[in-house]
A protein has these predicted regions:
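A mid-sequence interfacial segment
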Residues: 110-127
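Acidic carboxylate motifs that coordinate Ca2+ or other divalent cations, activating on Asp/Glu
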Residues: 34-38, 58-62, 85-87, 107-111, ...
């Protein structure tokens, strides 16, 4: 009877730990985007990453991103606020303006760089949504 209980316990542990083990880890954003290797991200590095993602997301190559291309990176309300001409799309400049706003929100010490701790904050995670 004890052996059966042990087997059940081991199987339960395996079942419940499998999803955690199978879940892919996200790459370290500092390592991904820190082109000068100083251990932080500055606005230029963030904008470079955002520009690259913009080009990748712009599947129809019209120079804008609509809600479908943004794939949930911005809520409808955020998209409307970031869209000064109210055409339902963001140009690269409009997208980078949102990126800069989120960068500034994630940089409470105003030192011009984001470290790992700042990127883990809610504002930092919101910024990372626009880079990945």
């Amino acid at each position: 009877m004890k052996l059966r209980g042990l087997v059940v316990l081991i199987l339960a542990a395996a079942v419940f730990s499998a999803p955690a083990l199978a879940a892919p880890k996200r790459a370290d954003p500092i390592k991904m985007f820190d082109t000068d290797n100083d251990g932080t991200l500055d606005l230029a590095e963030v904008k470079k990453a955002a520009s690259a993602l913009f080009a990748k997301l712009d599947r129809d190559h019209d120079g804008t991103l609509d809600a479908q291309e943004l794939r949930g990176r911005l809520s409808a309300k955020e998209l409307a606020a970031a869209d000064p001409d109210h055409d339902g799309t963001l140009t690269l400049d409009e997208y980078l303006a949102v990126v800069e706003q989120r960068f500034n929100a994630a940089n409470p010490d105003k030192d011009g760089t984001l470290d790992a701790k700042e990127l883990q904050s809610p504002a930092g995670r919101a910024l990372l949504q626009l880079l990945r």
